[in-house]
Amino acid sequence: MSGSGAMLLGLLILVAMATSLDTREICWHQSECDDPNEWCCIMGTSYGSCQPVCRP
């Protein structure tokens, strides 16, 4: 395996670990949240995350 390939693999593993730690669902619309008490909070970009309270 080349150096750049190993680096890319390591990066993918880091991203996978980071996303698995974040238990919030990624959403685009309120209806995508499994919990009816949660809102789809848009985080400055096009998608958001399901949270009970949206912080500014």
From Swiss-Prot:
It is found in: Secreted. It comes from the Eukaryota. GO terms for molecular function: toxin activity. Its main location: secreted. Residues 1-23 form the signal peptide. One of its GO terms (cellular component) is extracellular region. Disulfide bonds join 27-41, 33-50, 40-54. The keyword Signal applies. Expressed by the venom duct. Keywords: Disulfide bond, Knottin, Neurotoxin, Secreted, Signal, Toxin. The cysteine framework is VI/VII (C-C-CC-C-C). Probable neurotoxin. This is Conotoxin Cal6.41c.
